[in-house]
Amino acid sequence: MTATPADRPDPGVAGDADWAAEARPLLVHADMRLCKRFDQGEPTERLLALRARAVDQLMRNAWARCIPADARLSLHAVGGYGRGELFPRSDVDLLVLGETAAQQRHEQALARLFALLWDVGLPISHAVRSPAQCTSAAADQTVLTALIESRPLVADAQARAALAAAIAPQQVWPPRAFFQAKREELHARHQRFGDTADNLEPDIKDGPGGLRDLQTLGWMALRAFGVKDLEALVGLGHVGMDEAAALRREREELARLRYGLHLVANRPEERLRFDYQKTLAERLGFADDPESLGVEKMMQRFYRSAALIRRISDRLLQRFEEQFDGEAVPVQLDAGFSLRRGYLTADADTWPDGDVVQVFALFAQWAAHREVRGLHSLTARALAEVLRDLPAYDVADAIARDRFMALLRGPRAVETLNRMARLGVLGQWIPAFASVSGRMQFDLFHVYTVDQHTLMVLRNIALFAAGRADERFSITHEVWPRLRKPELLLLAGLFHDIAKGRGGDHSELGAVDARAFCLAHRLSEGDTELVTWLVEQHLRMSVTAQKQDISDPEVIHRFATLVGTRERLDYLYLLTCADIAGTSPKLWNAWKDRLLADLYFAARRALREGLEHPPPREERLREARESARTLMQAQGHDDATIDRQFAGMPDENFLRFRPEQLAWQAASLIEVQIGQTLVKARRAVPDNDALEVFVYSPDRDGLFSAIVATLDRKGYGIHRARVLDAPHDAIFDVFEVLPQDSSADGDPQRLAAALRQVLAGDLLKVRPSRRAVPRQLRHFRFAPRVEFSESAGGRRTRISLVAPDRPGLLADVAHVLRMQHLRVHDARIATFGERAEDQFQITDEHDRPLPDAARQALRDALCACLDPT
């Protein structure tokens, strides 16, 4: 912007509108030119400076237009604008400096200035202060932070000196206090984001490893050492040239992301939301290929940048701390290692370049001494310098491999693996792990990057070992002690997803990697086979439990045959629990815990009794009745009452439910007469939100649909529904539900009362409620898929439905089934992020499987209901 309307004589306030009308397109055209240069790949750092310079000129011209030359006021850029970095949609922060009398004398002129700048289209944020007011306001360190980066726009030497004196360390916030405050602020900010950058929609600016971390280091350096950028600290010995270069490189990466994000969002957006990720990836040139989406590549680049920034930032913060506190007297540990102010140090004369054995010795020391706060900054830097020279396991010697296995078998093994991953050592030792580092999957199911998910799985395994997982995992503490070698489970967890992103079946490819690793580390053939099998089959137990009917003896027989041994079952069960719970904080719940435990016990029994002769149906019925009878007798019920209740329950009931469920159902039925309706609800697990709902009712058109719609309206998500025919034309409905949103209060009595009220009315008038699709789900739409097959020996039709998830989905499906006059006998509801994968066993109104014509009509109706377009 080399010429603005302000270059002409000021015609007064009356001409401001014309001036703004001419200045506005100049600013727009300047942004358009910068946008074009951005798309051509020009360094973002230069574009930010050019945009700030363009706004500078407009500011000076507007100031000259509105403020008299003798006003004794000065104009300063502060904050990011003061740094000379102005992103496309960022606020323009200004400080007007002058004594109170001058402020009051020119109050109208200042108001005119700010109005004019807003009319031009600049999102200004301004403060008008005297030097003394600056000192007072700077008692808030966030205000001081903005002021220490001030840059004069219209100010003489006297004004600049006055501002510098007002916020000098002698006046407010000496360097040590400022450092401590900023470090605490950084820690609190990280905690707001769960102390990880690996979120699905990370914050480029404020998240861990984001631009704000780099700015924080810069503010500390400016206050403590008086330098304008981190590169200047190289000469002072506080930052290495390699570290400064790495931070500059990663700053450019993040700045480019943020610049592009402002452009595609057309607002000051700082989060990489799903709304913008694909568009931004395309704009930045990240293209899809057979193995990865472009958006996944872009996000991986971001996650890796954030991780590196955090590693270097941790080192610099420690060095700044030492600058203020001085060197501490070392406390000697084992030969070659010591503690300095709680930080583990490898002595310089014992640190051999590229010696991975010595690196593993460092981590062994860390694991052996709980008092260690972390690595000393000099040791961490030395490790970073030799990192690329460390050999991978397949070219390292046997001693190094043995040392790694010793770490895996030693105390705090999972903590050690986490540290090795964070510092880049694990990816160097296992290159396949480096390949998945920072790799995200563009869906709502996997909320962590592959490497972070892997580490979450390992942490869950550590909880099993410590016995602290009992609240969430009902039987892991019973199974864990049976493990012959816990390190084999850790290896399976480490490799289970390591082949993601290569194309092909990641379970099979990962099994190949796991086998090679085990053989290289001299594991026995039996141990190698176990780890390989676990990696290859790590999804099998989850799929069986969630997508098949585990009350079906054929399902149990197939699964137990695949597993083959009790040892494999123990390892697979623990790996499955750790995997599901480590995929998303919301994925693991009481129903999944119970489902996997039921499958575990059923498979264990099948293995114990022999796979050749599974127990016949009559024997299973007898055992279930006897177990339920024992429980009811303990509750004070006599045999006559028990027999009467059992007679009113379908045989299928005794094959599908656990004894304690059968006892609860039978005891509940004592209250009801033939032809009446009963609704009961209870907590399935004490101190848990999971509820079990039992409905006994005469068979009525629309019963299932009305129950499902009511549960949905009350904010409950259905995880399983079973519908059984009972004597006297009655229906048994059993639902396993969990609160899904804030409208569900979790009270079983209130839920049962609400259902009774609905079932007492006209069921055909109950309609699914309509709710908006959440923002995140709107970005993962795909065409629904409906498939049919036979079930129950050809007596029923199975529908397998895959569709984009949304609120009220199941209620809509149930309504379609009712409108088609179909009966639901079983429903399995599974949600995997944005995907709903549901199965229903149905018949027509005469209890017959669906012919082809009826199937096609149902498919059309379901697709019309579920199609996101």
Curated annotation (Swiss-Prot):
Regulation: Uridylyltransferase (UTase) activity is inhibited by glutamine, while glutamine activates uridylyl-removing (UR) activity.
Domain annotation HD: ranges: 450-572
Cofactor(s) the protein requires to work: Mg(2+)
Keyword ATP-binding (UniProt): no
PROSITE patterns named among the record's database cross-references: ACT, HD
Residues covered by region (Uridylyltransferase): 1-332
Pfam families, sorted: ACT, GlnD_UR_UTase, HD, NTP_transf_2
Keyword field contains Repeat: yes
Keywords tagged on the record: Hydrolase, Magnesium, Multifunctional enzyme, Nucleotidyltransferase, Repeat, Transferase
Domain ACT per the UniProt entry, residue ranges: 692-771, 798-869
GO molecular function: [protein-PII] uridylyltransferase activity; phosphoric diester hydrolase activity
SUPFAM superfamilies linked to this entry: ACT-like, HD-domain/PDEase-like, Nucleotidyltransferase, Nucleotidyltransferase substrate binding subunit/domain
CDD domains: ACT_ACR-UUR-like_2 (cd04899), ACT_UUR-like_1 (cd04900), HDc (cd00077), NT_GlnE_GlnD_like (cd05401)
EC number per UniProt: 2.7.7.59, 3.1.4.-
Matches recorded under SMART domains: HDc
Reaction catalysis annotation: [protein-PII]-L-tyrosine + UTP = [protein-PII]-uridylyl-L-tyrosine + diphosphate; [protein-PII]-uridylyl-L-tyrosine + H2O = [protein-PII]-L-tyrosine + UMP + H(+)
Location of region: Uridylyl-removing: 333-691
Residue runs in coiled coils: none
Single Gene Ontology BP annotation: regulation of nitrogen utilization
Written domain comment of the UniProt record: Has four distinct domains: an N-terminal nucleotidyltransferase (NT) domain responsible for UTase activity, a central HD domain that encodes UR activity, and two C-terminal ACT domains that seem to have a role in glutamine sensing.
Functional summary from the UniProt entry: Modifies, by uridylylation and deuridylylation, the PII regulatory proteins (GlnB and homologs), in response to the nitrogen status of the cell that GlnD senses through the glutamine level. Under low glutamine levels, catalyzes the conversion of the PII proteins and UTP to PII-UMP and PPi, while under higher glutamine levels, GlnD hydrolyzes PII-UMP to PII and UMP (deuridylylation). Thus, controls uridylylation state and activity of the PII proteins, and plays an important role in the regulation of nitrogen assimilation and metabolism.
Family assignment from sequence similarity: Belongs to the GlnD family.
Protein name (record): Bifunctional uridylyltransferase/uridylyl-removing enzyme
